[in-house]
């Protein structure tokens, strides 16, 4: 993987039709708790403003991919590429844990360790690794997927689009320095807005709705 600068930041927002929506931010930060509280307050304020602007104007996953290809030169990652293999492996594990945990037997629930106890943490990590290996060995037919990984490049940095047509999953993640992040943030907002929401999403505040609001509130 390419080495990022010390000021590199990354953001991932992932959501599915029924699954959880997650936001991951990573970067070097020495902010104090007060600054974090202020930042969170600003985010909540922005979120309320964004919610008032959301209207139903949905597009399908296929339409969104074509839109990104036409406007941002989106390219697809080959299934043989390491990144694709890692992503689909993670998706398979996530889907089995969420929808078919019974296949894992006693490994479906791994107790959280005592983080002050090194032996407890090592045992926990060992079980997580064993479970991941168990899932990886399961046939793909157990949890059918139609996964595709795409990229939009800006110089040496890129935005990734993760899509699964079977599970209706749409996710974006990107990284880079502040200048690149600003561009990717704008692209991300445009793509989430184009994917949009249905009237039912707005009415029921679905995961798809939450995903859009979250992205536009960042």
Predicted segments, located by residue:
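Mature, Sec-exported extracytoplasmic domains of Gram-positive
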Residues: 1-17, 21-218
